Amino acid sequence: MACNLSPVNEMADSITSSTPSEIVYGGPGSPDEHRTMSDKVQTMASAIYRELETMIKVHGEDGVKTLMPLVVNVLEALDLAYLERDEQTAELEMLKEDNEQLQTQYEREKALRKQTEQKYIEIEDTLIGQNKELDKKIESLESIMRMLELKAKNATDHASRLEEREVEQKLEFDRLHERYNTLLRTHVDHMERTKYLMGSEKFELMQNMPLPNMQLRNKMGMAASVDASSIRGVSDLISAHMTQSTTMDVNLANHITNEDWQDEFSSDIEPSPRDIPQSSADALTSPITTKEPTPKREAASPKQSEEEEADETTSVDPKENNDLLGADLTDDESDWNGLGLIPRRHRPNEMLDDDDTSDDGSLGMGREVENLIKENSELLDMKNALNIVKNDLINQVDELNSENMILRDENLSRQMVSEKMQEQITKHEEEIKTLKQKLMEKENEQEEDDVPMAMRKRFTRSEMQRVLMDRNAYKEKLMELEESIKWTEMQRAKKMQQQQQNVNQKKSGGIWEFFSSLLGDSVTPPASSRGNRASSSRGKMTRSVEYIDPDMISERRAAERREQYKLVREHVKKEDGRIEAYGWSLPNVEAEVSSVPIPVCCRPLLDNEPSLKIWCATGVVLRGGRDERGQWIVGDPIYFAPASMKKTKTSNHRPELEDEIKRARNLDARESELDEWQSSSLVWVVSSNQGKSLIAVLDANNPNNIIETFPACDSHLLCIQAVSGVMEGEPEMNEEQSKKYLSGGGKIKDLPEGLDGTDLGACEWVELRKMEDSEDGVPTYCSNDMKPSPKRTRDFSISEVAPVDSSAPVKEDPLPPPANRPGGRAALPPHIRDAMSKYDGVSGQMSGALPTVWMGGQNQYIYIHSAVTAWKQCLRRIKMPDAVLSIVHYKSRIFAALANGTIAIFHRNKHGEWSDEGYHSLRVGSATSSVRSLCLVSTNIWATYKNCVVVLDAESLQIVKVFAAHPRKDSQVRNMQWVGAGVWLSIRLDSTLRLYHAHTYEHLQDVDIEPYVTKMLGTSKLDFSYMRTTALLVSNRRLWIGTGTGVIISVPFSGQLEKKIETKDSKRPAGPGGLVRVYGATSENATNDEKTNDDFIPYCNLAHAQLSFHGHKDSVKFFLGVPGASKNGEDESAEVTLRRMLIMSGGDGYIDFRIGEENEPELTGQSIRPRDMSHLIIWEVDAELPILSK
């Protein structure tokens, strides 16, 4: 029967302690209160005892009756003084050691800072040199570009000058052409008049006369060809004479224009064949032929062409010039002869007389023409000479301009270089000044070191940056230290209060008992004075002035806490659009009420042990095992259908191998969701007090009935894990097989910053040897080279009862009959009794192959207990190199995380029992940091080391991946939970949860719960604003989150990430939410039901989060999910798919945030109120049962 949660109406003021979320190893332990007296005090007491005995014999008891209490008080004060001195000496040694460590760390940080600054200076110098080189290159490129621009400008100017010269030459050519045409017309008119005067006969006779030479005859071909029949008018004659004159006067054309204009002019005035006879054309073109320019000459530059023209003009010798001039004159004479006007020196004597009258007129015109031709030749020669001189002057001007521009650019470049050099000189002078200033500062450094930082005049930016970084680091450390100090000082106050009460209540002490034999029972010790002295001495030893009066401090804190809970209660009552149901604050969304967890029980762990502090728990797995005959004991989990298990075999059934394959595939498909259904409702809860651990066994279906309690060890247990019995087909390990897993480290290359990969992944075999039998008879094993580790103690007690000596035997309280006895098993549910009955006939020798429970302790031991037989009897005890922090079971292997940075892997032998030959040790990191937690993810083991997650292959024992889950190195990964294809992580002292992909290790989502809790519970002084996650659980596709302030949150998973994370509907108030950062996306088409386990990514949306009003006063220690029994009226033989899942949370104290602690009456005579004790809260959730057919 489940226990219903009844509201508690009576409240009382209580002192709540803030338990630190992280175990600090190596802390100081509590002093032993029941120690023996010091030797000196004992010697003095013996001497005084003898003296008092002598006085009693002489004077009787009345003589020493008043003296003896004074003597006893003096001796007690002396003993306390010795005790105080010893404690102060020990404390002084610890402070010295801490001081040395801090000094060493400071020196190391100082050296690292100097190295960093030196590297920074070197890098800065390198960059400055590179910048200077680049500046030089840029300057050279700029100078080259300026020279090229100058050359382009000069070429443009030269082209423009050539164009202007070309225009001038064209104008000159037009003027000369016009003048030549005028002369030609005058000459033609003269020829016509001469022919008219002479007559045709004389003209023909003159044509037939022989010429003096052939050259003159050829040159006169034009005049001879022009007869009356061929010349049809003045225009034809003008055209013929223009062609002759143009052809004969080639030298004149060369002086006037360049080659291009010569070609153009020749083509424009060339006569057609019909106008000139063939013989005349040949005569005109044969003596003087213009040479066509070659392509090479055409491609030459204008300047080169001008030089060639000048050379051609100047290279003509005087003989050629005379020939040309003679040709002109001869041509004129031939023209006269062709018209019948022969000069006088060439005429015969008989013709002289006849022509005297006509010679006078013609000779006058000829002389005028000859004078004009000579004048024209002289002018052309002078023009050519002037052109040559002009071209030379232009070339000289161009050269001088170019030289001037080049010199100007060089001057500019030198000026720029001078400016650069001046700047460098200025920089060097500034550097020299800076160096001088630094030198002066170095000389005065000794004096400035004595001056505080705030009093110094100079405060540079680097110093400010360093101070800010140091301040932030110190602030983070201060927050952690304040939390630890709060816990430590609270326990000190409670211890002092209890010591004072114990001293006041005691009737006899150690020294008083020593002297009690001298007097009768009527004499009582002065307890009040002794207690006052003890209290005062303890008060002086306490550093904090706040805890000198613990009663006053307790009352003040209780009053503050009541006021704070009152504020929380008022904030919770506000209407914010949310729904309250079953003690939960639900979002106003369309959700089924059946999905809300229903609280069914809330109770202290043990009523008769109010000082116990709950720590961890596990659900016992009643499956697997092997008996003495080698037969397998198979216990089917609850997720197999009972109806399918009762089916009889038929001839048509499939082969057993196919059924087994299908069963394995179905199990692998939803492995993470089926793990929570493998255990039973039998729960082992670990609690501790005064450094001793106690195990409480209960059934989650009926938690009010504690089945059995027994002490586990004299140390604090840090973890517990239920392990199933050996299963058929699980691998075994022998000495030969163990060697194949041995390997060295350094194989993983891509490592996060700050993680040393030298020994990462190194696996070695550690042999075990059996130690000498202990007093309790438990077989104890340790490694061959085991060395005694440094003593690590921590006081986990807040008990007001005086601590018991650890060497004294533990007195067990009367307990109910154990479950393994016939009387105790009747209290168990029927399904647990049936499961345990299968192991009744197995002897104790085979208990290692049966279901067991493994526990890891702070005292570096692993304890193995049987889960089905004698629970309190420890089967084996293994000494480890360091404290055991986490234990995970995978098939036939146990993975244990140790505080020295290693993982121990235990195996089964061929008999199915856990091997005592040895175990594998896998190195994860340095021994200064611990492997905090382990989590089974498919076939891998995820281990947390500092801020990193190390993924280990559970079968090959090889590290496959290492990634950083948090950027800060000092932020340790605390909890991990796997479901589907995602793993949720929580970070120590951080309110943000992180989701990673289980196979690709991709960061998928961040969820910050701090804004959500602040919105729900307000910003009071209960540290709700500084939220940290202390417990995580994934059950039935729901994430349970426990915080350091006792707040419990449950968030249903969604198979796909919703696009709209925050509700922004204006018609209704927005639901509470927090920071939700998404790094991945899933398909929107697939639904949750269609997804397989490997495809299901457990995204969270705080808009659907549910907050429980039932919580703990301190941090939530653990969550545990176990299957519940069938509901009343259900037929267990029927195949059902809806079963109960019980979610259990454990923590210090209980609080209902809707009520708080107001108006609770004080409980006099009790040191701990009921609501301050460790509590268990159990919820019931209707879960869909993943039934698989066998």
UniProtKB/Swiss-Prot annotation:
One Gene Ontology biological process: regulation of JNK cascade
Domain RH1: 24-112
SUPFAM superfamilies on file: Quinoprotein alcohol dehydrogenase-like
Effect of L75P: In ju146; increases the number of lgg-1-containing protein aggregates in the neurites of AIY interneurons. This is further increased in either an atg-4.2 ola316 or atg-4.2 gk628327 mutant background
Primary localization: cytoplasm
Tissue expr: Expressed in neurons of the ventral cord, retrovesicular and preanal ganglia and nerve ring, intestinal cells, seam and hypodermal cells, body wall, head muscle and pharynx.
Name this polypeptide is given: JNK-interacting protein
Record organism: Caenorhabditis elegans
Chain's gene name: unc-16
